[in-house]
Amino acid sequence: MSPPLPQAPQQPAPRRGLGHDTAVAAVCGLVVALMVGASFAAVPFYNWFCRTTGFNGTTQVAHAVPSSAPLDRTVTVSFDSNVNGLPWKFEPEQREIEVPIGKVVTVYYRITNLSRSDTVGQAAYNVTPLTVGSYFTKINCFCFTEQPLAAGESRDMPVVFYIDPAFAADSENDTVKTITLSYTYYPVRDPAPKPVASSEPAPRKGNL
């Protein structure tokens, strides 16, 4: 019987030095910093991305009223409002309305700056159910631009929209009775330069 072969001595696992741990911590810190910094630029980019792709129930944009007459079918449109990181009060004048499909409708939201400083915000938005976003079409909306508010200022802002008649032709929408339009206002860190001409909202009008 042959004697057992000698086993090679086991080498201890290489120890990670302090430099490796420091590098990992630095990378994690950089990622967090980038995420925080990007959050201030995320609202306009997110809106652009969603308008381009239709992601997350984002509505469509139109520059003219629909050519066909409104349909007999109606849906309930609910209006939601939220504020994130701004000293603002933000709410719709009406919580919900009945809308004939294809009819152009104007509703208003009101914002109030509750602070003693001038502030600027911009709204991100979406529609639920998410599949309805491609049929919910806006002609005019305060969410298209930044909204500066002086200390204590209030403003009524219109949303002009219609639901595309193609909504009724899509069988997936047969059970849809309620559509929710939701906005969330975020602060703008570096607002765009204010133009020389005034860009205040047009005087209020009733439903188109």
UniProtKB/Swiss-Prot annotation:
UniProt KW Plastid keyword? no
Query: Per its record, how is this protein called by name?
Result: Cytochrome c oxidase assembly protein CtaG
Family according to the record: Belongs to the COX11/CtaG family.
Record keyword Acetylation present: no
The record's section on SUPFAM superfamilies has:
Ctag/Cox11
Assigned keywords, A-Z: Cell inner membrane, Cell membrane, Copper, Membrane, Signal-anchor, Transmembrane, Transmembrane helix
A GO CC annotation recorded here is: plasma membrane
One Pfam family this sequence matches: CtaG_Cox11
Residue intervals on the Periplasmic side:
43-208
Q: Where in the cell is it found?
A: Cell inner membrane
Query: According to its UniProt entry, what is the function of this protein?
Result: Exerts its effect at some terminal stage of cytochrome c oxidase synthesis, probably by being involved in the insertion of the copper B into subunit I.
Cytoplasmic face: residue ranges? 1-19
Q: Which GO terms describe its molecular function?
A: copper ion binding
Q: Which InterPro entries match?
A: CtaG/Cox11_dom_sf (IPR023471), Cyt_c_oxidase_assmbl_CtaG (IPR007533)
Q: Which gene encodes it?
A: ctaG
One Gene Ontology term of the biological-process aspect is: respiratory chain complex IV assembly
Q: Which residues cross the membrane?
A: 20-42
User: What is the predominant subcellular site recorded for this chain?
Assistant: membrane
| Membrane disposition | Single-pass type II membrane protein
